[in-house]
Amino acid sequence: ISMGIQSFNDDKLQRLGRIHNAAEAKSAVNLAKVSGLKSFNLDLMHGLPNQTLEEALDDLRQAIELAPPHLSWYQLTIEPNTMFAYRPPTLPDDDELWDIFEQGHQLLIEAGYQQYETSAYAKPGFQCQHNLNYWRFGDYLAIGCGAHGKLTFPDGDILRFSKTKHPKGYLRGEYLYEEKNVEKNDRAFEFFMNRFRLLEAVPKQEFEHYTGLSQSAVKNQIDFAIQQNYIVETPDYWQIAEHGKLFLNELLALFLDE
């Protein structure tokens, strides 16, 4: 079970358009704990409108106090066709965001959480297996209204698809909403867009297995990424470097089909 807490600050929750408050969020977490759930996740956001460093850290402290086995800590992104897109709020600048991440990350590490993905932290043994499969470019089924899926076929074709979003259409039997084949020219970008979010090393054989491409297809991009200190390379693995984490968008852009 995953709970979209987002913040324990009632003013921030209202600004985000959420219908719950901090007390209700904590009550839901405690209900999950007393019901016997061994594993659950809390979603938190940072970089919220007018959010200070201390407010962001206070959200984390309150989350840590609830002792979730897994915690997802995302930076707010402004999506198209949303209230924030039409009326952009004042957000923390890059320096403030870095302070929030650096100090928040340290709080989580000191509390016994291990970061295994850009926005995911877990107690030992509680990494989300679905997340790991997803970020490793594995396949997954779309079960239910609005669900997304990915399938790789024996001939190497890769299909992404989604189910009907509205329950009324789904109940009428209109299950499939959209499907798209992942073209060969896009597979390297999609693979690394997923794998480089994980902090673990990327086996080179997995690149070939999941994309159907040879390593030579990305040799120039890999060589440039190494020169820029975005990644390090061994005979068997590629590993994102600290510098690459800071410039992830620039690293991924190398693999875009032009």
Which residues does each PLM region occupy?
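A short, conserved structural fragment
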Residues: I226-D236
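Minor-groove-contacting beta-hairpin "wing" of winged helix-turn-helix DNA-binding domains
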Residues: Y237-A241
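Short amphipathic alpha-helical interaction segments
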Residues: G212-I226
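C-terminal scaffold of the Radical SAM
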Residues: I1-L213
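Solvent-exposed, charged/polar functional surfaces in cytosolic regulatory/catalytic domains
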Residues: L107, F224, L254
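Short, amphipathic alpha-helical interaction segments positioned at domain boundaries
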Residues: H243-E258
